[in-house]
């Protein structure tokens, strides 16, 4: 493999055995592609905004004299960029402008004659835009729209598993689910009649639907039944025979063949042998006794030709006397329905008997009564209702997916049918459910991923937009009918409010629009790749059973079987597998390599769950030779959802990668194959809660996916084009682009601005640091700057800690963790948290609130950190209770005492009519002010601080732009110099020419002269562009802010809080091994090895066997080896050994094991080897991909290379006594994470605080500054101890005895430590509740 300059800084040793056929796809594509389809112009009009417009427009007036047509739309430019939106707290969106055409028709002339056409662009609200990382900024916060897994439209057949009826009989049902519109269900009842329900309402006999579609009884019988024909002879009947129909029946008479031989005697069972005999003798007729036809059902009406009297009606049983009448009337041929108990049930025939309707109108009225109970039906209303239910394109749409699923299930050609149902469709569904009831077909598996599809952002936004448009449509139709159309323009008809309201509601408060989990890059990526079965149109937690939550064979390679939350949502919220993607229908598909005649090719094909079932698919770990031929005779593979063994020649596809089945979070766990699945689930979930540490450190034992994840997450800065680093500082990187990657006529400079110390959604700190130096050559995709939790472009969620597995004085009982003081001193797990505190000045009834440093009754010391505007300085260190922003609120007029009046008269009246409502630091917080933002309403005078901040921003913008201009100008001038040199100037002449005049020189060569003139033009353009950009920025900075009604000013203060690790914080490894820190132990007391090096962390060995996450032990061994190799390299560097020796050792490390990774260290220059060695001295980073990782043998080889015992165990000594422990201890390096469950956020104690209004008991919870509940069981405990006085105190003065507790404060102040318990308030509440039942209880107080 060829490594770029940056990649050569640090190469991860990969233990993967299989070559990578397919790179990990871009991880956020599910979000970005979906939204792109929504906003991009689609000429076919099948999706996105275009589809929504085309489905609603044209809107015709009721009279048909005018219509409003849609022409095209365009999205404008957003006013603010993403960062500005986050700071100002507004939505990142673009205005939608739609070109509409209003057409008026001439009433007098022929229909369709156009009288007038008006075209106009109309504003239709703002559409939130997706940022390049797949998120939305709504009201200043980043949100993610989670994709939904819902039941695909189409037709589904199912049964109730015998649960509905007490007999345990299985009742089948069919359901037609449209994309939008009414559901149509068919179901059997215990008596085997078929019923229909519309929208899950009251059931009707299914034949009512057929009658409503204008089928007669005769038509219905002909569609659903075959016939048996009889001819009447004198005293017997002759039946037309199809021998196959007799199978399984018991003969009620002797059955003779065509030659008159008895084939089956009376009372015997007819078998396949008998049927073969009858077929052999070519028997086509059979004489049967007259009684045989009695009880059979007539297939049609029989009418006396002379009198016209109906002798036998269709679907009725034939009696003996009917036969006599038919003979008399001269009717010789009779047909009956072919029915048998086994596989031709009489279901429709029975249903017709229940059906009370006889014609179309009665059926329509019956349906109308069921849908609209209580309304009197009219013929037109009934017809319109039924027509609108399933046959109107406005009200019903199966969608492309639904039609495809419907046709495939009913074996109809794919191109037949539209978005609405046809008569044939309904008949086909009824035929299929009868076929299933007859046992000739199977029911569907609704948890199969071929029956569930993904609805992503774009599609959901389109649906919401359409909802808004439909609301507008009604209003437009009314306005078209009412007003004088000659005067109106399209914009007078359209009100954009309903549209923006629908869109806003979806992005702001839909269940699937979630506050982005921004703890670290992994949690961002997994949140965007999440697939939820909950949400509108999905399941609910309470109703979801086990089957839906379970892992299904079709999840293979599509949804991760590991990563799902614990708790009530388990299995309902899933994560997309690493390589999965959605196809055009919204079904998940996964890639496979094609296998031809036992040879694996490199052709990759994506298969959906439906297609996959047809093929035989082998796993990724089968043995292949050099040509890709499968070596094993019998190969483990999957076919039709089952795992089997098959011959190599039968294999049609094979997996692309062993990591194919798991999600990104699970594939970050090394040695995943050695962990129990439950613990792996916890490991995957806990990595998402890791807090970014102060100094990120790459994992020594990784899986090789860390880099792809960090780059795709968007937290690092990756180079857009190759070039050379021209300038680097903490907030900006400038790259001079390579000549071959330039677009014509551009300056060839890329500028990357870095994000510095901003706050994430979870209050962690987002900060980018450059990881390149001036002069470094870079290629496209190289990482230029690290973000939070990344280290040289690798994801780095935690720290490599030296771990020993041993008990230590009970301090690691029950998963507790003992850590060394050194971890705290070195700031290994120190994290920075940024809190945003805001102070709002409002306009109140009594006057407006004011932000000022002049606060009543506050001492000088409290104001020491404020400036003259009353706002805290940047850099001030503040603690709980300090004032950040001084604010006073007008107080209502109160009756003044004469003394106060006198004081007012003397000192002026300002001080007493305002009260202090300043923003203070919350109690448990101490930190440093790192930023202050002031937002002022338009038209309100800006204070001094706001103007200062504005000027600072303007200066910053000017500096940024002028530096950018300088760099671009330099690019132009350097090209001009090159031209002049080529045109005959000498270097000395060039040096003498002032910069400004370079572009005005004259060259003899005409082409060069024109090039120089072009450069001069470009320079002018740059100048103009600079002025324009600066003016635009200045205008943006100085304009007033659009604040909520009644708000005059908002001041936001950002505090940075530094949190070191301390007892009570939660830590975890990557294998679900979590624990809480119990003690921070002095370095000298920690166990140490023979070299005197103490360990960092002591974990309990009992946490491993019962939990079966052995991966952590292997990780520790591998980590020890990696660190040991790093130590050896460091020693070589310190001893300044020959580069050749260093190169040899590094080569040995990379070549170890049977891996497919080949690092050609020989091709590296000496400088590159030394630079690589400097990055490896902290440990050789290794990668063991899931299911394809390092084997035990390789770990031992690594330990040998590091010069460590292959047991992985060392002799340790007790730090307190100096004695060796009695047996060797497993010591190595484990990657530990600090999780976002910090004791500082949870610790809470109440002195006195607020009380609940009704019960007068203290509130609960940290947010309310609440107390600890002394509950029922705690009362029992005190009763058991007989602690009567303590109990009385708990139930009265410490809780809800209002008078008692105020009296107690007074007593404490007076130094009298006694209490007088009174009546608890909750007793009075109980009395009131009993009175509300009408029972009067009064308390006689003595």
Swiss-Prot record:
Belongs to the RNA polymerase beta chain family. The keyword 4Fe-4S does not apply. The lineage of its organism: Bacteria, Pseudomonadati, Pseudomonadota, Gammaproteobacteria, Alteromonadales. SUPFAM superfamilies: beta and beta-prime subunits of DNA dependent RNA-polymerase. This is DNA-directed RNA polymerase subunit beta. Gene3D superfamilies: 2.40.50.100, 2.40.50.150, 3.90.1100.10, 6.10.140.1670, DNA-directed RNA polymerase, beta subunit, external 1 domain, DNA-directed RNA polymerase, subunit 2, domain 6, RNA polymerase alpha subunit dimerisation domain, RNA polymerase Rpb2, domain 2. The RNAP catalytic core consists of 2 alpha, 1 beta, 1 beta' and 1 omega subunit. When a sigma factor is associated with the core the holoenzyme is formed, which can initiate transcription. It comes from Shewanella amazonensis (strain ATCC BAA-1098 / SB2B). Its EC number is 2.7.7.6. It is an enzyme of class 2 (transferase).
